[in-house]
Amino acid sequence: MVSMLPKADAATGITRKSYAQLPEVVNVPNLIEMQLQSFVWFQEEGLRELIEEISPIKDFVGNRLELEFIGYEFREPRLSEYECTQRDQTYSVPLYVKARLIVKTTGEIKEPFDLFFGDIPLMTALGTFITSGTERVVVSQLLRSPGVYFTISDDPATGRPLCHTNLIPSRGAWLEFETSNRDVISVKIDGRRKIPVSTLLRAIGYSDDLDILNLFEVIDNDPERHYIQSSIDRDPLIKDEISALIDIYSRLRPGDPPNADNARKLINEMFFDPQHYDLGKVGRYKVNRRLELPDREVGDNRALTREDIVAIIKRIIMVNNGQDTPDDIDHLGNRRIRTVGELVQNQFRIGLVRLERVARERMSIVNLEVVTPSALVNIRPVVSAVKEFFGGSQLSQFMDQTNPLAEITNKRRLSAMGPGGLSRERAGFDVRDVHYSHYGRICPIETPEGPNIGLIGSLATYSRINRYGFVETPYRKVYSKLKNNDKKLVGLKLAAAVSDKDKVLASAGSVVSEENFKLISKLPECDIQVMPFVSAEVKYMPADEEDRYIIAQANTRLDENGYFLDERIEARLAERYVIEPPEKIDYMDVSPKQIFSVAASLIPFLEHDDANRALMGANMQRQAVPLLRAEAPMVATGMEREAARYSGQVIFAKRAGVAASVTSEKIIIRTAEGQDDEYLLKKFVRTNQGTCINQHAVINKGQKIEAGQVLADSSATENGELALGQNCVVAFMSWQGFNYEDAIILSERLVREDAFTSIHITKHELEAHDTKLGGEEITRDIPNVGEESLRELDEDGIIRIGAEVGPDDILVGKITPKGETELSAEEKLLRAIFGEKAREVKDTSLRMPHGEWGKVINVRVFSRENGDDLPARVNKWVQVWVAQKRKVSVGDKLAGRHGNKGVISIIAPVEDMPYLPDGTPVDVVLNPIGVPSRMNLGQILETHLGWAGHLLGFRVATPVFDGADDTAIEDALARSWLSAKAGATDMSPENKRPSTDTAKAVEWIKQQGFDGKKVFDERHPGLAKEVSLKLWLKDMGVDASSLSGAELEKKAYEVSSQSRLPSPIVGKSVLRDGRTGETFDQPVTVGNMYILKLIHLVEDKVHARATGPYSLISQQPLGGKAQFGGQRFGEMEVWAMYAYGTAHNLQEMLTIKSDDIAGRAKAYESIVKGEDVIQPGVPESFKVLVKELQSLGLAVEVINEEVKIAPSEKVAALTEANLPGSEDVSAEILPETLYAGAEDIEDSMMSVIDTDDQDLAMSSNDEEVSENDERS
């Protein structure tokens, strides 16, 4: 523990008091290393493997041409990352493959030639890809590993457990083995009909019954069950290799005539040819381990062998006989991760296979004398395969950039879905559930709440992925014995005496000295028993290897030399929890937070929260909007620094030096060698989610800089720590019912001081195209637009930077030529006088969308004249960025880090808020009823410890499962009370935060008869609490000098209950109502809580419509804010209107406010003229219903003189019952009759759809909709 008051961090200036009990043995690894390493592997090895797979390409006959690929290189990217984001381009590098062409007929070897193989998207230093100007992330895929799996299922008839086995290759046909209740082992090849396993054995060379029985005589020795004999007896007609081959061939190729040679070739191709069957490195490694085959080099034979099949059948018999355990398919030893490199490699392989096929076809037809490698190779399949993957794959995702944590989590995400994976419909409970093998590998907390729960996970903090794709986690090695010549023996305690014949060299319990070691090392090689100790040696282990060891928890008590302090240790062995003596412990966890992901380990007091609420807390932190004034949490966990570091949004100094220049856009550090390190800052950059990244320097010119020091913060960091929210003074109490159902009461102070104000940036684009009628023009000269609307536009018709814009304001003026019509004499005269100006153009300007506003912060113009690369038929392209400063408002969603979330119900004046005895009003009022049922008590502990830190003037770090306990929190509250009592707390308004004069407090405590230094020393837990309670009881007139421990607490509770005054350690205060000045009935929990504003902002959701677009068929208003739609008046709302008998309102809702076309047009006209609205007509949806019924051949009529839908005689003509002389219609002319009827039906349907244009033009922005359609 940290003593007294903590010192400020030299690099950041933040004072953090850490309550961690355990030392940091292993530093948090690079959190995005998985992405970076995987892509480097693809560039260096993955691509080479692919090129070796297809090289050389030969023609179909094999005697004309041969194309060899002998190497490849990536050249420099054409555009930088910044240029790609600005121009909506893809950040990529050109790939060139060196090819050599051999003309077989002449033996000529042509000069090697560099072939361009397309542009390959390049990963940025932050593990992302920029495609079409947007940042994307390729999510890693978690799927079943290639290999062999033995599972058990109960036979439905007998209830007997039987073995079922799958052999899954990386590429090729599956083999499925089954055992029947009659002891027959059968096999399915690629899902076809099953055959006895004896038939497959005969086909691969074990033709004789005796040969087959001899292979398994050692294993198949159960006197009651003879699996191999039963399988042989199952198919008595097949007795040799040829009949077995023909039988298998006829099942696999049922249409082809069977033939022994063809059959042998098919079997060899399907299983023993590496071109068609590939277990992969991983599959071969898993098969060798599971079948306990002799260790061959994994790359040696990636196809199947006869020995593999025999070994699989032996294992099936052992599992059936209970001599071997079945596999758990959800165990992480059986699931592997495909990282970005492998996913891109698989996609590239698809393109290369297509390329190879095209090249072979061209080889057969080209002229050998003039052939070149470029004439044979068509790179389009490769380019399209890669483009398709990055643009459209389920695993290539639009990066979540809401805040830095969201970015890191997106890069560390694991998905069980995607190509070759699961779908959410088929995935059951087992695959979604938390598995014991996830410990330290996949976070048990962080996963989505919806239908993807358990299918999408997140890597744990310390986990990494090995070369086979299995997740590993680190453990510290525990030694209880060492070799006698191991130098690590020096300084260790011996568990048993070491002797040489009769002479004792070192006694039990003694420490091995240098002299002792020299004597011991001369003994013949042997193991020396030492007292079990935890070394600093760290080993990363995959899940299947871990199952063999007993592993202690990270919080096991150790002394300073690493020896265990307890005689019995709580530990894990696979899925069991055991208590063992220290001698049996093999490894120990490196950290309590190794179980959790980054987001979960940012939740303080996670151990006191229910798992469901912790899940919500972890997910909601990713939705927090970066605020105008970033503030790091008062109560943190210590992971904030790591999250900010690896998000890439904080700039750290690479080398030490002096700040030579510090501006808003650039920092230059001059090193001791006189070299300049330049750091560019991002200014108001729009993220994918519309939030803002804005870096600002935290150093001054001339300041000395250390390597690794924070130079610049981002929008969501403070001094290099993640800062997603604000520290607020909260009170848990009811207040006028405004916090009913988790609603939140907010003080107006937070709005006034911009505590929860955030910046949101929208990007608007406009292109000027060439059309058939002429080119579009970006101009200030727009028809029928007043000067008022053009005042902020420059001479080119583009808005100026800094302009304030609102809904429907013009951002970029644009005119489009209209279709030319026959000109009248007057128009011809005007055209002759004014030339082109008088021609017909329409206004297609870019305007601010409805309901949006802000300030223009940037404008970029690209044009062909300036040499910019633009798409075909685009002459000019303008981008406008508009920033909004959004204050917090009623309806916004706020949340804590413990899954406690709510919507703001009222923003109350500061003077009305409840206030503390010193007059400080609280910032937020939360509902106490929201705590007990949710079981997230972490928020209460955070509130208490945050309050103590706030009053004592320091911030807190309390890591998950290793933080402050109840006593530490009570002591902190007691010290804050004692400091206030001593008058040592400076609460003056000019100070941003309160501060404590510890010396003054210590002196005052001394005057009261207690040791003040010990009270403020962490090495005396509980003392501060005891002293504060005694002094408080003394103030309350109770002598407690003789009381201590539980008695003292009991007495304090009694006095507090009677007096309704809180004791110093309960974290409560007597509050007064700001409106009346009276005290509330009971003391209220008041403290400091970290609150986040989530991206679900009410401003994005509030929407209103007067007139707008209508659906073409139903003629009802469209729905949703994006379509500028109306509010749905559904079935239940109609019932409510029925219930209240509001007939006229209901009629309006169902007619003129919806789809009565004529009625709504007349109603609009009546409102404009100030007349009464006339009687509604028939809704269009009713007419459509009638027409649909008529199209089914039903004679539906509307019996009403006013409503004309279809003449009754026409309806009658469409039905067979009323056809003239229908009983006389012969079979020959019936088709013509029906066809004529169908044509009539089609005509009547067209009359429904073909609605009048003027009715559709009711929409106020219908013209705009059609223009948008034209543009898109």
Swiss-Prot record:
Q: Tell me the keywords, alphabetical order.
A: DNA-directed RNA polymerase, Nucleotidyltransferase, Transcription, Transferase
What PROSITE patterns does this protein map onto?
A: RNA_POL_BETA
Q: Which SUPFAM superfamilies match?
A: beta and beta-prime subunits of DNA dependent RNA-polymerase (SSF64484)
Q: Which GO terms describe its cellular component?
A: DNA-directed RNA polymerase complex
InterPro entries xrefs: DNA-dir_RNA_pol_bsu_ext_1_sf, DNA-dir_RNA_pol_bsu_external_1, DNA-dir_RNA_pol_su2, DNA-dir_RNAP_su2_dom, DNA-dir_RNAP_su2_hyb_sf, RNA_pol_bsu_bac, RNA_pol_bsu_CS, RNA_pol_bsu_protrusion
Q: Care to name a GO molecular-function term for this sequence?
A: ribonucleoside binding
- Reaction(s) catalysed (UniProt annotation): RNA(n) + a ribonucleoside 5'-triphosphate = RNA(n+1) + diphosphate
Give the enzyme class: transferase
GO BP of this protein: DNA-templated transcription
Q: What is its EC number?
A: 2.7.7.6
What top-level branch of life does the organism fall under? Bacteria
Region Disordered: start-end pairs: 1250-1272
The protein's matches in NCBIfam families, at most eight in alphabetical order, are given as: PRK00405.1
Return the HAMAP family for the record.
RNApol_bact_RpoB
Function statement: DNA-dependent RNA polymerase catalyzes the transcription of DNA into RNA using the four ribonucleoside triphosphates as substrates.
UniProt family annotation: Belongs to the RNA polymerase beta chain family.
> What does the record note on quaternary structure?
The RNAP catalytic core consists of 2 alpha, 1 beta, 1 beta' and 1 omega subunit. When a sigma factor is associated with the core the holoenzyme is formed, which can initiate transcription.
Protein name per Swiss-Prot or TrEMBL: DNA-directed RNA polymerase subunit beta
Gene from which this protein is expressed: rpoB
